[in-house]
């Protein structure tokens, strides 16, 4: 069976059509055109705002004209991650998906189910002539994964809906009614390289980690390639370490899976000590990271790098950076309140750069952890920039659409849904600032390992999610 044969057929075919269009964050030109043409070909009012968001409006079905207008929202962009041994160009190639047991996944890359399943769901609704629904305002935003630019720059006054259904939650028995805000902390310092003569050159590679979403997966105690690499570099300090290059992590909102460093030390005894350290690190992560690999290669071509003194400073700075769960919520059991992820560590030509992302459902705690991270680099004279701050979404337990969907879920599936906030940056908080008073909820099919090449979406959950989506459109409340 092929992906296009799965049920509901229309939804899966729209997903495959979407995945044939390259759509990495900040490179959404082709998918914007694709969605715009999709709406125009259906004869529906279609508008692309100056930022690149696409809005398609569909009149209510006969008999549903007096129901409240519903905004249905998903983001067009996807995280572009691939395995080190996968040859793939996200700018020119479509995602190659396939069925793996109960799941759909991709060949060596992210699948794009985040948030492609949401986009495909909206497309299926827009194209349907049989689904009963109120007036629909389909909102396709851009650049959610690298700054939520589309949500931030969405024009005011072009949407009239009172209810917003966000389709970016990744568990089919969960309703999200709140989310974390976030802020980026970027640091830089330029060192003067020195000529390296003598010593022994090595390339150190940390790979095989699971990675994942630095918000939703931060509590799973997965390894951070940048922090693991730094432990190796710290060991090398005893052998007159001189760092030439570091390239760790890839995306600001993904847990780093790989890191590569080129270094010079003054003794091969370092290798014996590294074997012991590698064994210790693997034992620490034996359950959460069973495929962790620490690889060492001899190289003779290292001619320039940092001095030993500057190498010590870099290692100590990275060591001092907090990474992981900072604080758990005191109001919702099991919810991460505040966290930080050291996403990128780069050293090249003497330029030392880090990128990290702090998240919190509390604005005060978000600012606190961001300043904590920044202080680690201010102490070495680095430039520190905090940017891209976006608000969280405060839960509303009195939400009308929440009550409707909880009741509907119980009747359809004979069980209670999980109602909770998530430790990730949904666009709902920003959209609520642009359009105050929206009654919002987020739901979706079950997606595992988003933001990594292990991303997969559960087939049965897609059908479950779709059936719930169709039914809720029938029971949207009437206008006041």
Roles of regions detected by a PLM:
Residues 2-102:
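Acidic/His- and Gly-rich active-site-bordering loop/insert found
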Residues 76-78, 110, 139-147, 168-172, ...:
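Acidic, glycine-rich active-site loops and adjacent beta-strand->loop/helix elements
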Residues 335-424:
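Substrate-recognition/cap regions that form aromatic- and gly/pro-loop-enriched pockets
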Residues 8-11, 330, 337-352, 357, ...:
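Zn-dependent metallopeptidase/amidohydrolase metal-coordination segment
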Residues 217, 224-227, 231-246, 383, ...:
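Active-site-adjacent substrate-binding region
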Residues 102-105, 145, 153-359:
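Midchain, well-structured core segments that form catalytic/ion-binding scaffolds
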Residues 156-157, 222-239, 268-270, 310-319, ...:
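His/Asp/Glu-rich mid-to-C-terminal helical/loop segments that flank catalytic regions of hydrolases
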Residues 64-140, 144-146, 151-155, 161-162, ...:
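Active-site metal-coordination/substrate-binding segment of hydrolases
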């Amino acid at each position: 069976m092929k992906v296009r044969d799965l049920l509901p057929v229309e939804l899966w075919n729209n997903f495959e059509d979407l995945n044939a269009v390259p759509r990495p964050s900040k490179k959404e030109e082709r998918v914007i055109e694709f969605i715009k043409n999709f709406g125009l070909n259906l004869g529906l009012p279609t508008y692309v705002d100056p930022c690149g968001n696409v809005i398609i409006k569909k009149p209510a079905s006969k008999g549903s004209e007096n129901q409240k207008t519903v905004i249905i929202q998903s983001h067009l962009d996807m995280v572009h991650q691939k395995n080190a041994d996968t040859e793939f160009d996200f700018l020119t190639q479509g995602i190659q998906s396939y069925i793996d047991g109960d799941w759909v996944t991709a060949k060596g890359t992210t699948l794009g189910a985040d948030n492609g399943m949401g986009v495909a769901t909206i497309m299926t609704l827009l194209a349907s002539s049989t689904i009963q629904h109120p007036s629909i305002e389909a909102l396709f935003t851009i650049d959610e994964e690298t700054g939520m630019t589309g949500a931030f720059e969405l024009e005011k006054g072009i949407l009239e809906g009172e209810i917003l259904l966000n389709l970016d939650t990744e568990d089919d028995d969960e309703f999200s009614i709140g989310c974390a805000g976030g802020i980026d902390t970027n640091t830089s310092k330029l060192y003067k390289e020195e000529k390296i003569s003598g010593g022994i050159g090595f390339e150190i590679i940390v790979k095989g980690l699971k990675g994942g979403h630095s918000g939703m997966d931060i509590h799973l105690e997965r390894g951070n390639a940048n922090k693991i690499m730094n432990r190796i570099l710290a060991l090398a300090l005893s052998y007159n370490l001189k760092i030439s290059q570091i390239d760790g992590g890839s995306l600001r909102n993904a847990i780093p899976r790989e890191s590569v460093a080129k270094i010079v030390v003054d003794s091969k005894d370092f290798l014996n000590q590294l074997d012991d350290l590698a064994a210790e690190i693997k034992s620490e992560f034996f359950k959460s990271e069973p495929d962790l690999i620490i690889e060492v290669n001899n190289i003779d071509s290292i001619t320039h790098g940092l001095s030993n003194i500057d190498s010590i400073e870099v290692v100590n700075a990275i060591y001092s950076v907090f990474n992981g769960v900072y604080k758990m919520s005191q109001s919702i059991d099991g919810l991460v309140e505040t966290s930080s992820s050291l996403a990128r560590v780069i050293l090249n030509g003497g330029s030392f750069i880090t990128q990290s992302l702090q998240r919190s459902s509390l604005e005060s705690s978000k600012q606190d952890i961001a300043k904590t991270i920044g202080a680690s680099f201010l102490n070495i004279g680095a430039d520190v920039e905090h940017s891209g701050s976006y608000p969280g979404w405060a839960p509303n337990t009195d939400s009308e659409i929440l009550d409707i969907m909880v009741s509907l879920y119980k009747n359809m599936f004979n069980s209670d849904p999980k109602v909770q906030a998530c430790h990730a940056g949904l666009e709902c908080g920003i959209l609520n600032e642009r359009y105050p008073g929206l009654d919002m909820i987020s739901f979706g099919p079950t997606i595992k390992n988003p933001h990594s090449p292990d991303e997969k979406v559960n087939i049965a959950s897609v059908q479950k999610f779709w059936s719930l989506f169709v039914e809720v459109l029938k029971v949207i409340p009437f206008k006041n």
